[in-house]
From Swiss-Prot:
HAMAP family recorded: RecX
Pfam families: RecX_HTH1, RecX_HTH2, RecX_HTH3
Protein function: Modulates RecA activity.
Protein localization: Cytoplasm
Domain of life the protein comes from: Bacteria
Keyword Cytoplasm: yes
PANTHER family in the record: REGULATORY PROTEIN RECX FAMILY PROTEIN (PTHR33602:SF1)
Protein name stated in the entry: Regulatory protein RecX
């Protein structure tokens, strides 16, 4: 006997149980399964009122997952792509800006084991950080501080 189809509400809760989703992302995932008469907007409203769906939690989760590997520009662009805007972005932007140079230095040390020997290698390493979304200022600071700790035997 075939299984009965999963309701839209159950499917939404299943998605949210695995990880946080933005409102836009969840609506996109649920749209192909919506039957005639299903109201995705009402379901999303109910999920937000029940605190199953939260833009703040999603934003914090995405930043936490991406901050160790990517720069502010990349993270903020990804948040915009998920439909996060307004005050939530402004708060996260301020938090992210504080440690971007340090994060860039960590990414640089993780990828490249030694400081650049020549201009070509330095340009390659700078392009790598730019592709990861780090600002020019943060990249400059990262090159100044990335390998200072290695000289210290302590």
């Amino acid at each position: 006997m075939p299984r009965p189809p999963i309701s839209l509400k159950a499917r939404a809760l299943k998605y949210l149980s695995s990880r946080e989703h933005s409102r836009l992302e969840l609506a996109r995932k649920l749209a192909p399964y919506a039957q005639e008469g299903d109201d995705i907007e009402a379901l999303l409203q109910w999920l937000e009122q029940s605190r199953f769906l939260s833009q703040e939690r999603f934003s914090e989760s995405l930043v936490h997952r991406r901050a160790a590997r990517y720069g502010n520009q990349r993270i903020l662009s990804e948040l915009h792509g998920h439909g996060i805007e307004g005050e939530a972005i402004a708060d996260l932007k301020a938090d992210l800006a504080a440690g971007e140079a340090e994060r860039a230095a960590q990414v640089l040390r993780r990828k490249f084991t030694a400081p650049p020997a020549d201009a070509e290698t330095r340009a390659k390493q700078m392009r790598f950080l730019q592709q990861r979304g780090f600002s020019h200022r943060s990249i400059r600071e990262a090159f100044q501080t990335a390998w200072l700790d290695e000289d210290d035997p302590s």
